[in-house]
Amino acid sequence: MLPKVETEALGLARSNGEQGQMPENMQVSQFKMVNYSYDEDLEELCPVCGDKVSGYHYGLLTCESCKGFFKRTVQNNKRYTCIENQNCQIDKTQRKRCPYCRFQKCLSVGMKLEAVRADRMRGGRNKFGPMYKRDRALKQQKKALIRANGLKLEAMTQVIQAMPTDLTISSAIQNIHSASKGLPLNHTALPPTDYDRSPFVTSPISMTMPPHGSLQGYQTYGHFPSRAIKSEYPDPYTSSPESIMGYSYMDGYQTSSPASIPHLILELQKCEPDEPQVQAKIMAYLQQEQANRSKHEKLNTFGLMCKMADQTLFSIVEWARSSIFFRELKVDDQMKLLQNCWSELLILDHIYRQVVHVKEGSILLVTGQQVDYSVIASQAGATLNNLMSHAQELVAKLRSLQFDLREFVCLKFLVLFSLDVKNLENFQLVEGVQEQVNAALLDYTMCNYPQQTDKFGQLLLRLPEIRAISMQAEEYLYCKHLNGDVPCNNLLIEMLHAKRA
């Protein structure tokens, strides 16, 4: 039985976070202030019919009407038919005209069948409780800020200048503190971020995915007669990459055309989060968190890093929950997979960021800021220095392999859909994803890196190394937690406790 706190934590892709501070020499976003009405864009609308939401029902924010409709349909085991073409428009004025299309839309936007009680008693199967509380708190915080200030900050588009590189962690902490006082921040322009997007809303990609049983619709890579699988999708990664905020997950090595990229890999790539937006969310969270702290409550270096890791973990959970194939799994299977690999995904994310970071002797933070490796090493103990050393060795190996974005995406899915996880209800899907991604990765490496005849095998050999580093990192973090050095009430700690339950 999973501990309650952990079960709820994984029902969530939280964008609300906890605090820290950022390097000093950051290019400041220029903001313009405009009149802002609270109702303008904070008022939530039901994703099914567009009516005003009444609260969280069966997995996401919906209106009272769609909540009742969904509950009655599931509890009464109703079966509907559509007299048209099963694509009826569902909105507030005609949501009752076609119950079949309405129910299908409920499912497509993310309402959870398993959250409805079969015994007709009041109260759902609430695996998402703390998510609701956190999300409500975030919305209330936004409302309070807007009402207090009466303005809306809009990041103005501007030419992005190169980030300074001589940054230290201490200056990072000072920078957030300055932001809370209204002092200039050397921070690049942040794109508007969608903090209130529900993690349960179905993405356009996942709605077009085939049934998961056979993974039909994707190229089967049992044989490789042509080594060139054409795709109708444009490939945004073949153009020359440009860093938006100090870094982006660009493709630093290969320049292959979409014709030489397996269709499955292109689909996996589409699931990747927008890195500048992730950076903006984490930065905004750290700034807000620091602004809420008194002078004597500022985070130390380690606390800051924990906050960054916690927010990165939330973005990883959100990525997983919105990804193809993973969405097809029931919540229990999703939780088991994420429980198993969360630290590996964190390490892999950090490793790839360093691979594409070109400056030697510095570490690229998830916020896009660079910190001298020597600065971190001087403040870290023997255990953390050992972990950092192993991570840098792995970075060097992957750089020598010319590790690129598409291979990174494949490894993320191989880590997520691990065959080591026991008692999965839909093990067949997990096994199928493993086989298909492995085959696509093999095809891709052979086609695009023919001079590296064993690149596929070398990439797979890095996975045990990532796991070893992640296990050491977990042990280190847990010991620090027991000593009271890790900020409490965050997803990192919830996951650590869950894994030891």
UniProtKB/Swiss-Prot annotation:
Residues 43-114 bind DNA. Its main location: nucleus. Keywords: Activator, Chromosome, DNA-binding, Metal-binding, Nucleus, Receptor, Transcription, Transcription regulation, Zinc, Zinc-finger. One of its GO terms (biological process) is positive regulation of DNA-templated transcription. A motif (FTZ-F1 box) lies at residues 128-147. GO terms for cellular component: chromosome; RNA polymerase II transcription regulator complex. PROSITE patterns: NR_LBD (PS51843), NUCLEAR_REC_DBD_1 (PS00031), NUCLEAR_REC_DBD_2 (PS51030). Residues 488-499 are annotated as: AF-2. It is found in: Nucleus; Chromosome. Zn(2+) 1 binds at residues 46, 49, 63, 66. A zinc finger (NR C4-type) spans 46-66, 82-106. InterPro entries: NHR-like_dom_sf (IPR035500), NR5-like (IPR016355), Nucl_hrmn_rcpt_lig-bd (IPR000536), Nuclear_hrmn_rcpt (IPR001723), Znf_hrmn_rcpt (IPR001628), Znf_NHR/GATA (IPR013088). Monomer; Binds DNA as a monomer. Belongs to the nuclear hormone receptor family. NR5 subfamily. The C-terminal extension (CTE) loop competes with a DNA minor groove anchor of the nucleosome and releases entry-exit site DNA, thereby promoting opening of closed chromatin. This is Nuclear receptor subfamily 5 group A member 2. It comes from Gallus gallus. The gene is NR5A2.
